C-alpha cells in the first residue's frame, strides 16, 4: 500500500493548490474503495478537506444496498458523502453504458468548485479497454488517446491517479489492508463490450504479452501528444476562423487543405461540446453545407444539432421546438416567459422615453413567433414588406426567424423584438425588452 500511496501522492502533488478539496467519485467498487483510502490518507497528511460522491443509477436491484455500504465506509473515515440519484435517457440511441457514464459525470460536475480535484478510480486495465474500444470504432489519434490522467473538469480538474496501476495490484492492496467492496453483477455480463474485453480478451493478451497494458498506455500517450501538437499548430488558424457568435468563416476554411479543415471542424465541435462526428459527416459539412448553392438553405443533421450556413459562415444550431403555433397575451409591466429556453419578454411603460405607442386596447396585445403571411413597415424603410424579406434585410439567420418574438396588436405587427417598431406604432409610451 505504501508504494501505491507514493505513486498517488506524486500524481496529486502536480495539481494540489492551497485551496484544493479532494472529491472522490465513490462507487464502492474495489477501485474506488482503494482510492478513498488513499485520498483520506493524503487529505490528513496535507490538511485538505475530502468528501465523496456516490451516483445511484437505479440500474441494479442492489443499488440501494450499495448506497448503505458506501455511507458506512465513509462514516468510518468521517468523510462526508453525497448521494446523487440519476435517471437515464435511453431514447437517444446510446448504449446503457454510455448513458450511465454521461449521467454520472453530469452529476459529479455539480460538486466541483474552483481548485477542487475530482478523483476517479480508472486504472491501467480500464485504459486498455478504452483503447481497444476506440480501435474497434476506427478512431483517430484523439480517440486512441483514451483517458487522460488529468484534465479540466467543471471549475476544477479531474484526476485519475491510478491510471498507471494494474487492476491486480489494486486488488492486492485492498486484500492486504482488509477492505470490503461492492460487486456490480453487471460486470460479468459479456453482452457489454467492455465486459467482453475484460473477461475474454485481455486475460489472453496479458498472458501472451505481459507488458501489453504498458505498451497500450505508451501508444495512447503518443496519440495524445500528436493530437496536442496538431491543436498547438492549428490554434492560430482556428482563432482566425472562429467568430464571437461561435461560427466558422467559410472563406478562410477554403484556404486550408482538406486534412486541416477536418481537424479544424473537430476543434470547433469539441469547443462547442458536441460529440465527434464521423469522417463522412466531416466531409458533408464542407461539401453539402459550406459549398452548397448561394441561394440554398443547407442543413446537416448531427447527433446533437445541425450545421447551418449563413453569410458565408458555418453555425452549429441546437435542435429546437417548432414554435409556429405558440402565442400568448402580454400584459404591461409583467414579464412573459417564452418557450424553449428563449427567456422572457416584457412590455414596460416608460412615458416619454419609449419607442412604442400604446394602442387603445392594450389587452389585445400578444406575442407570436410565426411570421408567415405577416407584413410590417419599419420607420426607417420606405414601404411595407413581408417579414420574410425584412428578416433577410436585418441579417437574421433562417433558423432564428421563427424564434424571434413578434409583438402583435390584433392581426397587426407592432414590433419585432430587437429589430424594429412598425411606423404605425411609433411613440414614446412603452418599450419592449427581450431578456434571453
From Swiss-Prot:
It is found in: Cytoplasm. One of its GO terms (biological process) is tRNA modification. Keywords: ATP-binding, Cytoplasm, Ligase, Nucleotide-binding, tRNA processing. GO terms for molecular function: ATP binding; tRNA(Ile)-lysidine synthase activity. The keyword Transit peptide does not apply. It is an enzyme of class 6 (ligase). Disulfide bonds: none annotated. ATP binds at residues 27-32. Pfam families: ATP_bind_3, TilS, TilS_C. It catalyses: cytidine(34) in tRNA(Ile2) + L-lysine + ATP = lysidine(34) in tRNA(Ile2) + AMP + diphosphate + H(+). Its EC number is 6.3.4.19. One of its GO terms (cellular component) is cytoplasm. The N-terminal region contains the highly conserved SGGXDS motif, predicted to be a P-loop motif involved in ATP binding. NCBIfam families: lysidine_TilS_C, lysidine_TilS_N. Ligates lysine onto the cytidine present at position 34 of the AUA codon-specific tRNA(Ile) that contains the anticodon CAU, in an ATP-dependent manner. Cytidine is converted to lysidine, thus changing the amino acid specificity of the tRNA from methionine to isoleucine. Belongs to the tRNA(Ile)-lysidine synthase family. This is tRNA(Ile)-lysidine synthase.
Amino acid at each position: 500500500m505504501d508504494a501505491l500511496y507514493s505513486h498517488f501522492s506524486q500524481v496529486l502533488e502536480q495539481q494540489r493548490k492551497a485551496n484544493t478539496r479532494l472529491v472522490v467519485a465513490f462507487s464502492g467498487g474495489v477501485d474506488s474503495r482503494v482510492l478513498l483510502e488513499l485520498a483520506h490518507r493524503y487529505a490528513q497528511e496535507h490538511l485538505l478537506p475530502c468528501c465523496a460522491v456516490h451516483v445511484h443509477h437505479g440500474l441494479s436491484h442492489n443499488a440501494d444496498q450499495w448506497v448503505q455500504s458506501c455511507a458506512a465506509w465513509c462514516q468510518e473515515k468521517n468523510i462526508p458523502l453525497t448521494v446523487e440519484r440519476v435517471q437515464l435517457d435511453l431514447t437517444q440511441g446510446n448504449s446503457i453504458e454510455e448513458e450511465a457514464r454521461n449521467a454520472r459525470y453530469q452529476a459529479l460536475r455539480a460538486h466541483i468548485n474552483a481548485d477542487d480535484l475530482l478523483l476517479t478510480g480508472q486504472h491501467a486495465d480500464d485504459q486498455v479497454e478504452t483503447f481497444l474500444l476506440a480501435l474497434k470504432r476506427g478512431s483517430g489519434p484523439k480517440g486512441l488517446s483514451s483517458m487522460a490522467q488529468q484534465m479540466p473538469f467543471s471549475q476544477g480538474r479531474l484526476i485519475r491517479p491510478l491510471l498507471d496501476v494494474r487492476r491486480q495490484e489494486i486488488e492486492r492492496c485492498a486484500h492486504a489492508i482488509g477492505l470490503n467492496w461492492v460487486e456490480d453483477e453487471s460486470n460479468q455480463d459479456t453482452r457489454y463490450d467492455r465486459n467482453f474485453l475484460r473477461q475474454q480478451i485481455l486475460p489472453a493478451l496479458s498472458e501472451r504479452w505481459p507488458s501489453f497494458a504498458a505498451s497500450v498506455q505508451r501508444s495512447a500517450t503518443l496519440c495524445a501528444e500528436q493530437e496536442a501538437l496538431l491543436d498547438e499548430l492549428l490554434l492560430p488558424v482556428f482563432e482566425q476562423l472562429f467568430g464571437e457568435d461561435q461560427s466558422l468563416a467559410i472563406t478562410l476554411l477554403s484556404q486550408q487543405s482538406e486534412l486541416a479543415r477536418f481537424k479544424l471542424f473537430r476543434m470547433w465541435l469539441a469547443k462547442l461540446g458536441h460529440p465527434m462526428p464521423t469522417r463522412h459527416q466531416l466531409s458533408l459539412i464542407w461539401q453539402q453545407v459550406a459549398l452548397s448553392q448561394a441561394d440554398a438553405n443547407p442543413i446537416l443533421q448531427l447527433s446533437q444539432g445541425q450545421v447551418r450556413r449563413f453569410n458565408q459562415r458555418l453555425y452549429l444550431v441546437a435542435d429546437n421546438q417548432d414554435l409556429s403555433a405558440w402565442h400568448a397575451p402580454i400584459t404591461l409591466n409583467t414579464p412573459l416567459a417564452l418557450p424553449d429556453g428563449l427567456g422572457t419578454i416584457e412590455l414596460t411603460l416608460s412615458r416619454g422615453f419609449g419607442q412604442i405607442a400604446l394602442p387603445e386596447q392594450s389587452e389585445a396585445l400578444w406575442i407570436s413567433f410565426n411570421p408567415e403571411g405577416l407584413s410590417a413597415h419599419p420607420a426607417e424603410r420606405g414601404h411595407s414588406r413581408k417579414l420574410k424579406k425584412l428578416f433577410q434585410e436585418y441579417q437574421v439567420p433562417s433558423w432564428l426567424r421563427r424564434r424571434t418574438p413578434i409583438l402583435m396588436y390584433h392581426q397587426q405587427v407592432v414590433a419585432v423584438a430587437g429589430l424594429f417598431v412598425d411606423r404605425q406604432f411609433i411613440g414614446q409610451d412603452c418599450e419592449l425588452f427581450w431578456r434571453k
